[in-house]
């Protein structure tokens, strides 16, 4: 079953990831015997990250003042500075920052996704619109799609595609004593796919999430049970599939 005939992707503006506690990414360097300098990274969180390294006071090298790379593994080599004069060392100072996501990846726009429920179950997806479109009558963002699914009984949500769990939010409890139109925050599971697309599933009971951070899931893998939405007999899933990209015409190097 194809859940999406159109491209269900949300073009997300570049937003810096703010780390709390231990840094999810660390970069160190080694000075080699040939006077080159190799930079290595360690990543303690799952998923892809875009890393930007900035250099100041570069001497004895023709290297650029900044380097940008998407990293996916837990560790590896990031880049190497080579000396212009092999007999002398390279002088430098460096800093770095990182952003969550596989930016400007080669997305498979015609990939067939399956429904996020038990095989053979009949469901009616409701297409969602942006706030700007609803309240300001503006045009829909290009390549933007999201859906909700409503049920009168609890449902088990399943993965629509193979991927790795990159984020789990399980802090919230629904208000079941009154009717609620909309929650600004929901318990959610975020899964990154091989081509850089990301699926966000929202609406879980915080005690019924079945996956762990970093776990690989497959189509029809159980993710978790939906929470009762409010005082009604209503269980609702919000599903969004998107990818990360920079603003058209704006270089990563110019984003501060």
Task: Label each residue range with its predicted role.
Residues 1-26, 41:
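Bacterial Sec-dependent N-terminal signal peptides
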Residues 22-75:
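Cationic-aromatic interfacial patches
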Residues 63-64, 149-152, 203-211:
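Short alpha-helix capping/helix-loop boundary micro-motifs
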Residues 70-185:
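Surface-exposed, glycine-biased beta-strand/turn segments
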Residues 173-174, 206-207, 231:
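A short acidic/small-residue loop/turn micro-motif
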Residues 188-213:
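Active-site region of chymotrypsin-like
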């Amino acid at each position: 079953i194809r859940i999406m005939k159109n491209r269900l992707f949300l073009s997300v503006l570049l937003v810096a990831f703010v780390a709390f506690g231990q840094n999810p990414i660390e970069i160190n360097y080694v000075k080699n015997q040939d006077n080159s300098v190799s930079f290595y990274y360690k990543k303690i969180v799952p998923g892809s990250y875009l890393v930007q390294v900035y250099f100041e006071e570069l001497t004895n090298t023709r290297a650029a003042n900044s380097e940008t790379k998407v990293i996916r593994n837990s560790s590896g080599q990031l880049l190497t500075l080579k000396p212009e004069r092999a007999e002398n060392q390279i002088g430098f100072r460096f800093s770095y920052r990182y952003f969550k996501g596989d930016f400007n990846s080669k997305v498979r726009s015609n990939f067939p996704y399956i429904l996020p429920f038990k095989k053979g179950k009949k469901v009616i997806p409701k297409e969602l619109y942006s706030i700007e479109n609803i309240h300001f009558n503006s045009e829909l963002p290009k390549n933007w799609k999201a859906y909700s699914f409503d049920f009168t009984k609890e449902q088990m949500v399943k993965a629509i595609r193979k991927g790795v769990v990159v984020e789990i939010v399980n802090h919230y409890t629904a208000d079941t004593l009154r009717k609620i139109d909309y929650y600004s925050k929901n318990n959610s599971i975020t899964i990154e796919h091989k081509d850089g697309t990301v699926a966000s599933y929202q609406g879980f009971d915080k005690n019924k999430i079945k996956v762990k951070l970093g776990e690989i899931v497959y189509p029809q893998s159980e993710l978790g049970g939906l929470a009762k939405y409010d005082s009604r007999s209503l269980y609702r899933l919000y599903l969004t599939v998107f990818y990360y990209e920079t603003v058209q015409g704006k270089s990563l190097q110019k984003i501060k």
